[in-house]
Every structure is written in structure tokens, then in C-alpha cells.
């Protein structure tokens, strides 16, 4: 038994001293492998008398169990140590300067950048950001916004509908961010001043349209709100966004079910071969739609139109990003081409501010 105790002690010491998993495996094979020292002792049990086999077998198996447990514990310690070493080697100091190459540094997508620019501009004017779900109800997307039954926008070729529920309702992918305005008016009392950026969906795909696109809408509800306020907000936005000192705007009569009167807005521009200059030239370009919130919409949202008035506007984020940064094909924004993103994308630390410059 003294030889067995000595062997057990030597093996346990070797297990404890194993510097890595390879060395530990060598100890295991030397002790418990086919030709290992403990395995060799077990093979001698067949030559012993029953009384000796019972005594020696119990002692050898006890030693085997101790070695097995020690191997398992040491293997776990080595695994944890290896993981700690790997984590330490991969630690990144976030206070260090970022790498310079685009492939290593990454790029902010132009749409994300423009959404940040919009947020900075309207936040400076005192607007809050409101958000809502992409999957909407027919009531919020159409009915409460004064879309009568049978309106073309309700048809399948414009809207992505889901299967009807048991109660007969039919969810849909929102076709504009106007449902967020509805939810805002239902959840808070005037005065209201919000912008609603987000994804929208329509069955359309060509050079200037995609089935999923981004839109931002603005809403102001207050006593005495009028078109003069709307014109000032849009004018200040265009000057800040396109980074020009002055911009001439043209309001044309139009029709939207949720506003009355409704208008489309053009801004003065000069078209070059590969770019468009705003605030100069003798051409015009439509950029958004707007109008005074229809009294029916206010009523549907629990607001008295005899006390409060409001105005709203909406524009495509993808479209104004294309105009500002000279992107010719909307579909390229969603193709995931790293070369395209390296060219049109922004550095991660290019956070747009009015003081520091939106796109500098």
C-alpha cells in the first residue's frame, strides 16, 4: 500500500504542476491510459486471491478516482486561465485614438448620419423625437388620418398587409410615420412639437423607390399655430440641413387626406452635371409635403379643432440624403457594398452638431 500511496502522490503532484492542457493530457495517459501506471496495477488484480483482490482493488480504484477528480479540476483551472489570458490579450482601450483605415474603423451609413443631422436641427428648435411600431393597425395608419374607405393607398399594390386576425382586423406595415403622430396626439395633450423618423414600407422598387425606406415627419399642435410658423420652420431646416445662408421656397397646392390646406414644397436650386446646388440658380426641386392638420384628424385623436390648430410635414430621409450627398441610385443604399459605404459613409466620430457643422 505504501507503493500505491507513493504513486498516487506523484501523479497528483504532476497533475497540479501541469502548465497547460497538453501537459495535463500527458499525465492522464501516463496514469490512466492503456499502459498507464494505475491501469497496470488494475491488470494485476486477476492474479490475486479473492481476499487480496477485494482489498487491493478498492485501494487502487480509490486512487484512480482521486486522480480522475484531480485531472478534471486541473483541466477546468487551465481552461479558465486560458480564457482569462485570451480576454486580456484582446482587451481594447476605448480611450485610444481610432484606427485610420476605413476597413478597420468602419463607416456610418449616410441614412444614419442624415437621421442624426435631422435630430440635431429639430432638437435645436425645441422638438422631441417620437417613435412607434413598424407593424400598425388599419385604424392608426389610415382611418384616424382621414383616409376614406376605398382610398387608393389602402389597395394591395401600395400596402403590405398581413393575414386577417380572428377579430377581422388586418395588421399592416406602416406606409408612413404618420401613425406615430396619431399615437402622440392620443397619449399627450397639446402643446405638441415632435418629429417622427423611422422606416416605412410600400410595394414599389426602382431607381428612386425601395419597398422599405426612411421617412421623417413633423407635427406641431398648439393654440394659434398657422402657416407662417410652418414656413419658418421649413425654411430654417433647409438652410441648416443643406448648409446654405439663404434658400427660396415655393409652396404649391396639393392634396393629402390628413391636411387641409395641403402643399408641396419646392426649393430653389441649380442643377450641375453631377450635383445640385441649393440656395442659388433658377430651377426648383420638390423636397417635401406639408399642410395644416385636418380638423377630422384632430377630432379622431381627441383634440378640439376649435381650440387647437396644427401643422405637419413629411419628407423622405433617403431622398434628401441622395440630394445632399450626390447619391444617384437609392437601391445602392441597401446593397451592403463595403466599397460604396467606404466612399459615402462617415467616420464613427463625425457626430453632427449645429455648432461644429453637420457634415464636416
UniProtKB/Swiss-Prot annotation:
Entry keywords, A to Z: Aminoacyl-tRNA synthetase, ATP-binding, Cytoplasm, Ligase, Magnesium, Metal-binding, Nucleotide-binding, Protein biosynthesis
UniProt remark on cofactor binding: Binds 2 magnesium ions per tetramer.
Coiled-coil segments on the chain, per record: none
Protein residues bound to Mg(2+): 260
CDD domains (alphabetical): PheRS_alpha_core (cd00496)
The enzyme's E.C. designation: 6.1.1.20
An MF annotation (GO) of this entry: magnesium ion binding
Keyword Aminoacyl-tRNA synthetase recorded: yes
Family the entry assigns: Belongs to the class-II aminoacyl-tRNA synthetase family. Phe-tRNA synthetase alpha subunit type 1 subfamily.
Subunit structure: Tetramer of two alpha and two beta subunits.
Protein name, as recorded: Phenylalanine--tRNA ligase alpha subunit
Amino acid at each position: 500500500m505504501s507503493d500505491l500511496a507513493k504513486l498516487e502522490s506523484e501523479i497528483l503532484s504532476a497533475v497540479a504542476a501541469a502548465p497547460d492542457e497538453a501537459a495535463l493530457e500527458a499525465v492522464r495517459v501516463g496514469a490512466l491510459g492503456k499502459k498507464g501506471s494505475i491501469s497496470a496495477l488494475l491488470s494485476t488484480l486477476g492474479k490475486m486471491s479473492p481476499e487480496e483482490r477485494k482489498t487491493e482493488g478498492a485501494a487502487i480504484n480509490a486512487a484512480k478516482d482521486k486522480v480522475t477528480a484531480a485531472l478534471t479540476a486541473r483541466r477546468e483551472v487551465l481552461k479558465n486561465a486560458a480564457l482569462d489570458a485570451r480576454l486580456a490579450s484582446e482587451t481594447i482601450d476605448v480611450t485610444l485614438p481610432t484606427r485610420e483605415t476605413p476597413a478597420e474603423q468602419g463607416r456610418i451609413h449616410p441614412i444614419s448620419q442624415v437621421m442624426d443631422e435631422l435630430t440635431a436641427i429639430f432638437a435645436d428648435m425645441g422638438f422631441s423625437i417620437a417613435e412607434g411600431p413598424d407593424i400598425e393597425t388599419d385604424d392608426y395608419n389610415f382611418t384616424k388620418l382621414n383616409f376614406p374607405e376605398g382610398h387608393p393607398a389602402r389597395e394591395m399594390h401600395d400596402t403590405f398587409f398581413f393575414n386577417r386576425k380572428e377579430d377581422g382586423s388586418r395588421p399592416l406595415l406602416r406606409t408612413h410615420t404618420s401613425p406615430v403622430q396619431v399615437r402622440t396626439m392620443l397619449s399627450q395633450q397639446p402643446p405638441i412639437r415632435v418629429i417622427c423618423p423611422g422606416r416605412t414600407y410600400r410595394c414599389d422598387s426602382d431607381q428612386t423607390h425601395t419597398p422599405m425606406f426612411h421617412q421623417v415627419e413633423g407635427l406641431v399642435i398648439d393654440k394659434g399655430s398657422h402657416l407662417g410658423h410652418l414656413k419658418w420652420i421649413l425654411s430654417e431646416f433647409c438652410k441648416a440641413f443643406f448648409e446654405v445662408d439663404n434658400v427660396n421656397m415655393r409652396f404649391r397646392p396639393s392634396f393629402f387626406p390628413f391636411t387641409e390646406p395641403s402643399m408641396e414644397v419646392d426649393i430653389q436650386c441649380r442643377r450641375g452635371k453631377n450635383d445640385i446646388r441649393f440656395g442659388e440658380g433658377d430651377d426648383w426641386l420638390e423636397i417635401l409635403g406639408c399642410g395644416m392638420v385636418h380638423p377630422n384628424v384632430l377630432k379622431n385623436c381627441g383634440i378640439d379643432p376649435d381650440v387647437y390648430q396644427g401643422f405637419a410635414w413629411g419628407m423622405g430621409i433617403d431622398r434628401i440624403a441622395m440630394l445632399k450627398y450626390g447619391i444617384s441610385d437609392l437601391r445602392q443604399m441597401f446593397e451592403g457594398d463595403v466599397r460604396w459605404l467606404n466612399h459615402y459613409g462617415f467616420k464613427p466620430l463625425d457626430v453632427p452638431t449645429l455648432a461644429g457643422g453637420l457634415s464636416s
